[in-house]
């Protein structure tokens, strides 16, 4: 009897997550059966929930808001990009029973921009809005693409300054932003409640791409704001979601899915 490999995504809330549908599409490409669920861990109960999942046969897990930094603390070892980010979105069970933490958010974002949308990051000026775990996780990979400049802005400027020092990028107060950006990436949590970041509409003049890390309806307020104020192209984070999921799947199973048909499949749902 063949044992079906079990995976899950931890978050709170997590009922909205599209990860199960995405990973089932990857499994169809590989020609295997997997089980992929959702676990809403209690705040303060993440470590216990992870322990129970792996002790009862779990093979790998994704981690979303608000547990990515807790997952980093929980892992026994890390990839270089997870260490740089200080946040983990992928837990891999090793043969020795230890957990390896990785962060595939940056790969998902950069692949969506450069491969799916065919927009180069190299030599571009990038603005990151927000300074939470989502933004922190993508900075190391964005830097690998050698942009001309990365600027970070956050509602609480001190948090932006902290990340700027950590990663060797620039921090600018939101109120002082005035344009000159090729790519603007919104990683604030405000999109989840329909709130726009407190930035001037002028920042979108001559912007090649405005990108929101969230996907679906939650991204529309920011994308409409960007497009109506001059952004040449706008995108939600569906491609990033599928891309980071594909990288996680590859780490667990050694099979690299084709993300393009899965992005189209998810758009059609």
Swiss-Prot record:
The enzyme's E.C. designation: 1.1.1.25
Active site: 68 (proton acceptor)
Pathway: Metabolic intermediate biosynthesis; chorismate biosynthesis; chorismate from D-erythrose 4-phosphate and phosphoenolpyruvate: step 4/7
Domain of life: Bacteria
Alphabetized GO MF terms: NADP binding; shikimate 3-dehydrogenase (NADP+) activity
Alphabetically ordered keywords of this record: Amino-acid biosynthesis, Aromatic amino acid biosynthesis, NADP, Oxidoreductase
Binding site for NADP(+): 80, 130-134, 154-159, 213, 237
Cellular component terms per the entry's GO annotation: cytosol
HAMAP family on file: Shikimate_DH_AroE
Role according to the record: Involved in the biosynthesis of the chorismate, which leads to the biosynthesis of aromatic amino acids. Catalyzes the reversible NADPH linked reduction of 3-dehydroshikimate (DHSA) to yield shikimate (SA).
Family according to the record: Belongs to the shikimate dehydrogenase family.
Protein name per UniProt: Shikimate dehydrogenase (NADP(+))
Gene that produces this protein: aroE
């Amino acid at each position: 009897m063949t044992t079906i490999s079990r995976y899950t995504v931890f978050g709170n809330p997590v009922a909205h997550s599209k990860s199960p549908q995405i990973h089932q599409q990857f499994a169809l490409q590989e020609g295997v059966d997997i089980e992929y669920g959702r676990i809403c861990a209690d705040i303060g109960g993440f470590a216990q929930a992870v322990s129970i999942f792996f002790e009862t046969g779990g093979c790998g897990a994704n981690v979303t808001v608000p547990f990515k930094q807790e997952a980093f603390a929980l892992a026994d070892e890390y990839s270089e990009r997870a260490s740089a980010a200080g946040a983990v979105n992928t837990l891999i069970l090793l043969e020795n029973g230890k957990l390896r933490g990785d962060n595939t958010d940056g790969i998902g974002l950069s692949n969506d921009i450069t491969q799916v949308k065919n927009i180069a990051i190299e030599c571009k000026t990038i603005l990151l809005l927000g300074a939470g775990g989502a933004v922190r996780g993508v900075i190391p990979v964005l830097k690998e693409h050698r942009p001309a400049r990365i600027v970070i802005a956050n509602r609480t400027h001190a948090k932006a300054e902290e990340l700027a020092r950590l990663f060797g990028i620039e921090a600018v107060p939101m109120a002082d932003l005035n344009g000159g950006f090729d790519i603007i990436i919104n990683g604030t949590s405000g999109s989840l409640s329909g709130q726009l970041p407190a930035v001037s509409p002028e920042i979108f003049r001559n912007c090649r791409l405005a990108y929101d890390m969230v996907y679906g309806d939650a991204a529309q307020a920011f994308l409409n704001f960007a497009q109506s104020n001059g952004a040449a192209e706008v995108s939600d984070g569906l491609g990033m979601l599928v891309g980071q999921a594909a990288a996680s799947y590859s780490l667990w199973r050694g099979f690299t899915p084709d993300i393009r048909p899965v992005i189209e499949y998810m758009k059609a749902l």
